[in-house]
Amino acid sequence: MDLAIQYPWFRRSLGSFYPSRLFDQFFGEGLFDYDLFPFFSSTISPYYRQSVFRNFLDSGISEVRSEKDRFMINLNVKHFSPEELSVKIVDDYVEIHGKHAERQEDQGRVSREFHRTYHLPSNLNESAIACSLSNEGLLTLCCPKTRPGDDSNWQDRPIPVSREEKQGTQPEIRADP
């Protein structure tokens, strides 16, 4: 009986064959060495690890944070302008939609579209929801929390997306009068 033996020094990532990379959003961008040869870097050094931070920023993955005093959603939408984004409240969910028409780029014609839906906690100050887009393409939705027991009655409405002028700032949270 033949047994397949994998030596510890030959541990390679499955690279583009691994299902988690199936929906990466790298359309129309340049290639890196590990995109062409995913096994090469880990074959030479089993201790080499690719940057998780780069993969997080470029993958379109969102981050949802529920802190003591506020609720935040961060989403990488670097391929979209504020005019191509739609953020709206529907029931107790926030829907984020981005779409731009087909356009010519260096590598060919590209069109992009996405839909994301997030459940909103019931203890948010609905009138103070703010949404902004940074220069780096990070969409930030921020909302302060109310006192425990104060539940929101969500009304369907659009949320305007503002463009941040400064790098690394978060949208202002308006105080309820």
Swiss-Prot record:
Primary residence: cytoplasm
One Gene Ontology molecular-function label: metal ion binding
Subcellular location, record wording: Cytoplasm; Nucleus
GO cellular component, one term: cytoplasm
Annotated glycan sites: 162
Region (Disordered): 146-177
Record keyword Chloroplast present: no
UniProt xrefs under Gene3D superfamilies: 2.60.40.790
sHSP domain residues: 52-162
InterPro entries: A-crystallin/Hsp20_dom (IPR002068), Alpha-crystallin/HSP_16 (IPR055269), Alpha-crystallin/sHSP_animal (IPR001436), Alpha-crystallin_N (IPR003090), HSP20-like_chaperone (IPR008978)
Domain of life assignment: Eukaryota
Keywords: Acetylation, Cytoplasm, Disulfide bond, Eye lens protein, Glycoprotein, Metal-binding, Nucleus, Zinc
Pfam families reported for this sequence: Crystallin, HSP20
Composition bias type Basic and acidic residues, residue spans: 162-177
PROSITE patterns named in the record: SHSP (PS01031)
Positions of Zn(2+) binding: 100, 102
Family per record: Belongs to the small heat shock protein (HSP20) family.
Assembly and oligomerization: Heteropolymer composed of three CRYAA and one CRYAB subunits. Inter-subunit bridging via zinc ions enhances stability, which is crucial as there is no protein turn over in the lens. Can also form homodimers and homotetramers (dimers of dimers) which serve as the building blocks of homooligomers.
Name under which the protein is recorded: Alpha-crystallin A chain
Organism of this sequence: Squalus acanthias (Spiny dogfish)
Gene name in the database record: cryaa
